[in-house]
Amino acid sequence: MSVTAERKAEIIKANATKAGDTGSPEVQVAILSERINNLTSHFKTHGKDNHSRRGLLKLVSTRRSLLDYLKKNDEARYKALLEKHNIRR
């Protein structure tokens, strides 16, 4: 369910705005989106796993907060991020 270190490194490399960038909203949203997608596929087989569902809701809320911040400060980056990760808004 969690993202492996190798996968996380790939995500960071693909979404970093500069070398060593791990804290930008784009990178954080990309990692959260990967975790959300993993949990979503988990729920296809484990529909009654309410403990993990709560964690999913927290991840979605955190991603939403980051997206709201990005929308408020730089709408072009926000729209590009939604497009890149196929996030519905």
Curated annotation (Swiss-Prot):
Keyword tags: Ribonucleoprotein, Ribosomal protein, RNA-binding, rRNA-binding
Gene that this sequence comes from: rpsO
BP terms from Gene Ontology: translation
MF annotations from Gene Ontology: rRNA binding; structural constituent of ribosome
Record family assignment: Belongs to the universal ribosomal protein uS15 family.
Organism name: Bradyrhizobium sp. (strain BTAi1 / ATCC BAA-1182)
Alphabetized Pfam families for the sequence: Ribosomal_S15
Protein name: Small ribosomal subunit protein uS15
Organism placement in taxonomy: Bacteria, Pseudomonadati, Pseudomonadota, Alphaproteobacteria, Hyphomicrobiales
CDD domains: Ribosomal_S15p_S13e (cd00353)
